[in-house]
Amino acid sequence: MKNILFVTSECTPFIKTGGLADVSGSLPQALQEHGGMEVRVMLPLYDEIDRSWKDQFEFVCAFTVSLGWREQTAELYRYRYNDVTYYFIGNDYYFTRKGIYGYYDDGERFVFFSQAIIASLEYIDFIPSVLHAHDWQTGIAVALAKIYQPIEELITVFTIHNIYYQGTMPLTTFDDFFQLGREHLAGMEWNQMINSLKSGIFHADKITTVSPTYAEEILTPYYGAGLEEMLWNRREDLIGVLNGIDLKDYNPAIDKSLPVNYRSARSKKIENRKLLYEEIGLNLKDGVPLYIMVTRLVEQKGIHLVQRILEEFLQEDIQLIVLGNGEQEFEYYFKDIEYRYPDKMITHLHFNESLARRLYASADFLLMPSKFEPCGLSQLIALQYKTVPIVRETGGLKDTIIAFNEITGEGNGFRFANYNAHELLHVLKYSLEIYQQPSLWSVLIKNVNKSKFSWKDSASAYADVYQQLDASSVSYK
């Protein structure tokens, strides 16, 4: 039996800002169901966690965490949910705030969390054989685990969810936050800054990321965000494991957010669309396909490409709904287009999970023209709700969506290769052509219905990673 301790900055169902929370919430349970492992999870006790959860947490103890020359108190709480044990690290100064990211001292906050992770190993009723850390917020914990060796022969795995977020801090924080010799600086420093993500990459026994294609991409300058050379040097220890989704949660047959549940019947999608349009004020047009974007409105998501071609595509007989928020420039743009095309487009700038699910259940197509996408969640959800993804060939989008071939009848969506607006427009018009041919559309939808990406496959791949990293295969120097 292997004992795995996940350390993460967010985790469903307690706190979520993005896909990291879904991984941290779903993968541990899938790993336990795979067998041969007990997986526990540790995360900060944020003020933002709902009181209905916090009232159930069991206080374990308080302990002292050294942050350079300072000493801070950490409180340890424990909770068991769906057969998984969760630990929460509390500190009023660092975690009693509105939201969980975006503060000037985020680096310090998650150095504290990383120090607390290592210190807490003395107080939890669990001796991990593997410490599995996620993203820059816990990269320092991987470094400290290797330096301090709090548990004999503790193996470390570090997962990169998005390499563009690296948790950098001024070089002076090395002396301010750590009681370490200067010989350890090289493993944390990058470009005259302390780099939390680099710290995890440098010290981990195994490095994973969230899709096979993304693992290849981050070895190149275009995607590597400055760390490609270091990753190239460790490429033998880098593996891409595709994320999954919870197929019980994202199930249109039982989803309580939907006014009309369904398995595969196309007519049920139209019923959902009719009710959705009544709610948001868009006129239903028979035979007109609905395209949706459920996304953050930021450059990474390919919004610049959409800006260049949207008005031309809106000349076609289609409708579009955009759900998401982000950069003001993009928010203003979509609201302006909505104003000028009121019968064809609606923009909803406040993300709402229930509305997102109703969009998936009503739409024909999901558009994801991402500049880069480590794995992607929306395209996997779309497939579950019988909605056809249109994606750029990058990261997990390339690994999960196969371009439809009208000759062979293979494929579960549409793809374009280059980050180019003309290619995007071409594939959008091609998707409309296929939609307008019922025999081809029927073949495509059958393929979509067969596409399943559960956590079961991800758990099996991670179990193999843990198994490979036995005590004889890693260095503890």
Swiss-Prot record:
The enzyme's E.C. designation: 2.4.1.21
Signal peptide: none
Sample GO molecular function, one term: alpha-1,4-glucan glucosyltransferase (ADP-glucose donor) activity
Catalytic activity: [(1->4)-alpha-D-glucosyl](n) + ADP-alpha-D-glucose = [(1->4)-alpha-D-glucosyl](n+1) + ADP + H(+)
Keywords recorded for this protein, A-Z: Glycogen biosynthesis, Glycosyltransferase, Transferase
Gene Ontology terms describing biological process: glycogen biosynthetic process
Summary of the function given for this chain in its UniProt record: Synthesizes alpha-1,4-glucan chains using ADP-glucose.
Pathway: Glycan biosynthesis; glycogen biosynthesis
Name of protein: Glycogen synthase
Entry keyword Transferase: yes
PANTHER family registered for this protein in UniProt: ALPHA AMYLASE DOMAIN-CONTAINING PROTEIN, GRANULE-BOUND STARCH SYNTHASE 1, CHLOROPLASTIC/AMYLOPLASTIC
Domain of life: Bacteria
Leading EC class: transferase
Lineage, broadest ranks: Bacteria, Bacillati, Bacillota, Bacilli, Bacillales
Gene for this chain: glgA
Binding-site list for ADP-alpha-D-glucose: K16
Gene3D superfamilies, alphabetized: Glycogen Phosphorylase B
Protein family per UniProt: Belongs to the glycosyltransferase 1 family. Bacterial/plant glycogen synthase subfamily.
